[in-house]
Every structure is written in structure tokens, then in C-alpha cells.
Amino acid sequence: MSDKSQNVMRELRIEKLVLNICVGESGDRLTRAAKVLEQLSGQTPVQSKARYTVRTFGIRRNEKIAVHVTVRGPKAEEILERGLKVKEYQLRSKNFSATGNFGFGIDEHIDLGIKYDPSIGIYGMDFYVVMGRAGARVTRRKRARSTIGNSHKTNKEDTIQWFKTRYDAEVLDK
């Protein structure tokens, strides 16, 4: 096991961070939520449509109800650090998926250091982090697609260990 942990190709890294705000309705609130994500990430957010009609919530199929933005690289790590600071570097083990990704939510975007603007309001958001290792692209590319072995795939235990050492955080077993 010690040989595997010292291999540079085995090191976990953040492939992408997805920030999502689901408003539940189209219109003015959705555009204000998009402004929040644009302030936070510096990128233009994309609007997401409802998959199907839910009459109890007043949602129609194909109605734009959410905005999200995908952030990669050092900017993703910096935004994730701010989000984890809000959560006080504590996540539950349920926040980690079997494939090694994790996510969490915050209640107020102003906790991230964004100045409060009364015309925008306060929005909560979800953070989704996709983890990966070097060389994992061979399973997703179009040309010369291949597979990777089970030992190289990310899993829940590896991600939890990486999370604890990287951010000096704790994972609660609730």
C-alpha cells in the first residue's frame, strides 16, 4: 500500500466544482441567482430546466428553474476552501458518494464573503466536487477510449482520507 500512495499518478485531485442554485421558478429570482453565481465564480452561469412537471410545486416541464456554473483549476480550489470554511471543515460521511465525489450545501451566499446587496437578496447553494486521478480521461475521450482498473478509480474511502489530510477537516459518522 505504501508504494501505491507515493505514485504521482495515484494522487487525487479536484477535476471540477459545480455550484448550483435551484430557485424553483423562472423569472426575476432566477436572474438574481445567476448574478450571485457570476459574482462568486467570475463565469457566466447556465440555466437548468425542469425534467418533468410537479404540480404541487407549480413547476412545469422545461421551465428554467435553476442556474449552475462549473469551475475548474485553482479557482475551484479557492471557492471550495471558502465553502468549507462556512461548514467549519466538517462534512458527514453521507456527503461522499461511492464513486469518490462529494457535495454539500450552504444556506446563505453572503457567508462566502460576497457583499450583501438588497436588490439581489440571499440565496443558498449546493457545492458538488468531482474527484479524479491523472489518466482517468481515457475512459471519457472519444478516440482510443479505454478502461482503467478498479485500483485507479476513485472511491469513498480514498476521498475521505484526501479530504481529512488536505483540509485538516473531520468527517462525522452520523
Swiss-Prot record:
Annotated keywords: Cytoplasm, Ribonucleoprotein, Ribosomal protein
Residue runs in coiled coils: none
Domain of life: Eukaryota
Subcellular location: Cytoplasm
GO cellular component term, pick one: cytosolic large ribosomal subunit
MF terms (GO), sorted A to Z: RNA binding; structural constituent of ribosome
Single GO BP term: translation
Protein family membership: Belongs to the universal ribosomal protein uL5 family.
Protein name: Large ribosomal subunit protein uL5
Organism (species): Candida albicans (strain SC5314 / ATCC MYA-2876)
Gene this protein is translated from: RPL11
